[in-house]
Each structure stands twice: as C-alpha cells, then as structure tokens.
Swiss-Prot record:
Residues 220-247, 394-421 form the PLD phosphodiesterase domain. It catalyses: 2 a 1,2-diacyl-sn-glycero-3-phospho-(1'-sn-glycerol) = a cardiolipin + glycerol. The active site is at residues 225, 227, 232, 399, 401, 406. Catalyzes the reversible phosphatidyl group transfer from one phosphatidylglycerol molecule to another to form cardiolipin (CL) (diphosphatidylglycerol) and glycerol. It comes from Pseudomonas putida. The gene is clsA. This is Cardiolipin synthase A. GO terms for molecular function: cardiolipin synthase activity.
Amino acid sequence: MHMDYHSPYFFGYLLGLIHLLGVVAALHALFTVRTAQGAIAWAMPLFFIPYLTLIPYLIFGARSFYAYIKARRQANQEMHVAMANLNWRPWVEEALTARESESYAALRAMPKLGRMPCLANNQVKLLVNGKATFDAIFAAIEKARDVVLVQFFIIHDDTLGKALQQLLLRKAAEGVQVFVLYDRVGSHALPASYSQQLRNGGVQIHAFATRRGWFNRFQVNFRNHRKIVVVDGLLGFIGGHNVGDEYLGGHPQLSPWRDTHVQISGPVLACLQESFAEDWYWATRQLPPLILPDAYPDNGVLCQALASGPADPQETCSLFFLEAIHSATRRVWITSPYFIPDEAVFAALRLAVLRGVDVRVLIPSRPDHRIVYAASSLFAFEAVRAGVRMFRYQPGFLHQKVVLVDDEVSAIGSANLDNRSFRLNFEITLLTVDRNFADQVEHMLIKDFEQAREITAEDSRDTHRLQQLGMRIARLISPIL
C-alpha cells in the first residue's frame, strides 16, 4: 500500500494521531505527576496543543522509576549481605544515644522522614566559601590511605577540575581505591577524555543516569544533585559546592560565589557512604567498600543525613521543609538560590508569620537561570505581602542551601527550596542539633543578611507590567521547572 504524503487525508490522519497521543500523555500525566499543579500544568497543554508539548513532555515529564526502585531494593539487599561482617555495634549505640538525648526532641518528625537514623557524637565544621571547602577536601584526600568516595552534580574540566583529577590520579597510584560519581546531565560539558584519563590511572569513575539505555539521552528531568566526599570512612563533606572555577569566584557575572559546605566526622559518615553506595550501585551494579570505625569519640553533636529523591515512598524533601517551618517557635531562616515553594510550603511560611516567628528567606540578586529567577521573584513579592522578610544577596550569586530553626537545629546540603529539589532531584542534607553549631550558622547568616537588600512591597509595584507578565508566565510552568 502506497501512502500519498501530499494527500490532505494524510495530514488529517497525522493531526488525529498527534491529538490521540496527546490525550494518552495527558492521562499519563494525571496518573503519574505527584502534585495537582504539576499534573494540570502538563495535562492541559497536552490535551489542547499536543503538537507543541508532546516532545517536551517526553524530555521533561516522564516519571517511570520502577527500574530504579527495583535496583535500589536489590542494592539494599546486597549491601546488607556485604556489610554483615562489619562491626555495626558502635554505630547502633550512637543511634540509641541520640534517641535518649534531650536535643532529639527538637527534630520532631524529621528523624522519621528518612531511612537513616539520627546519630550522636559527630563533629561538624562550617566551611563558608569555595576556597575553605576545597582546601579542606583536597587536604583530606591528600591524607587518604584506603578509600576515597567523590560525588558531585557538576564536574568541570577547568583549573579546579584538573587539580582534583591530578590529585585523584596521584592517590590511585599510591594504592588508594578512588570512586568518582557525577551526574550525566549536570556534567554534560565534561569531555570523555577527563573520565578516560582517570580510568587509565586506576580511578573508578561513572556517570549517574536515572534511566538506562538510549532513551536517557532525551529524558533529562531527573538529576542526582548530591555532593558527597568521604575519605577512609573518617572524614566527610556535604553541601552546595560543585567542582568548577565558578565556585571559587571564577565566573565574572556571578562572582563572588556564595556557598556553604560542612566537614563531618563521626557515625553519620556511614550514612553518607550508604547514600553513595546506592547511587554507585545503580550506575555500576557494584558496591564500593564501606568503612566503619571500631569506636567513636564520646563527645559530639546529633546529626542526621537526610537523603531524598523521586523514588522515595513519600516526598521527603518537601516534607522536611514543611516540618522545619512548622517546628519553628522563634525563627526560621532559609537561604536558597531558587524560591519556588509549592502551596503547602508557602502556606507553612505564612502560618509561621502569623505565629509570630521571624521568617526570613535569602535569595540571589543575580540570575543564573532567567526563567527560574523570574518565577522566584514573583513568589518573593507574594511572600513579602504575606509578611515573610525576603532579601536579595548583593555581592555575587548566592548558591548556598541552609535552614536555621530556632536556636539548635540547622540544615545544610544540596536541596533548594523549589519543586525540582522537592520532587525531581536526588538530594542530601545534613541536619545538626547543637546550640554552638547553630550559633556559627546564625553568625554566618547575619553577615549574609547584612550584605543583602530587603525586598519591599514597592519593588513589586515598581516592576514593569511586561516584566510582571513574564514572571506570571514563568510561575505557570514553575511546577515543571
């Protein structure tokens, strides 16, 4: 049978097929997208203009994680077998000690959100910029004797990236086992030669991709946004920095870059290793070595590693922000490069204001993604009208992800206050319960607020109508950003 492509019937059939596929995709969105806003944001355009939205939905909308969930369960089973010979008794004792401490109550429901428990007797150190962070990371790797685990969302082949590469090659030549994991989407500009040089030198390096096979080239919605470094199971790092010169202030338009990391030692490092192991297993079907000390110091602070992702049975990251805001009795200060709260988190912020809580949110004054910046600006204006104190950091680009609740609880990690971190990305955050550490975080944030300009109601009124239109369009698609 010969198809006449010039026949008017052909185009009619083609349009009919596209609309049929649009209906099917719209139904798929209604059944799979977790929020009503996101489902409507996809379903309506798919139903009415499928010829414009089918391909974007294929790229950004697919939400099938059955393979990942199955692999993670298999990884957990294999990890339990592999870890059976390790001495977990000291670690379990720290979990029990944490539950019995007075500070534990300050976390409220937070310990129940994740798979990993709250643990006592950890040591934490605040790293308030890129130089302090990478000086500490490089110094720790220099002293490595057994195993180095490195995971970043972005690795660039620039001055900092090359310095890390050479250091890892040198340690591998000394006999240290080195494992490097990066996100395929976040590190899309990383040349294959960078990874190949590491492999040639004995470093095990792999990309994390949430779907296997050729389709992953087109499906970019789900990203592993975690930043983890663990050295010999004794020293670890977690926070907002990636590997690139811009994180040291090397990007003129965004410099100076403002970000925060934490250096950690203690039993919570087992949780960072477990998170890395799960992601590594998904990428390689193999498990890296896990190192547990035979004993921990008797002095330290309560910490919990909260790993979250789209394969979780509940929306762990979103629920964390909700509980952190709801638990505040005196203050909740949040810094995030993006401010796109869902309805529940936005309502929690408004309620906190009504309770008399000092609610402050610090966001950038410069955009790195213009659509997200526009949507964030509109949400910021609405938050100001609700009584939330919104600030824009002036010196450079603000990328840190920090939450401070009252006088004891702080959270530092990779999660932004936006829908992508809530429901699409794999994130990890370190919760710490300690008055002294919270004081350090407070001192750091006060300095940041001193270098910020508070957003006022006049800023909204002074915004041009065309800009306001752009912001509202950006907000319409914010559930899928």
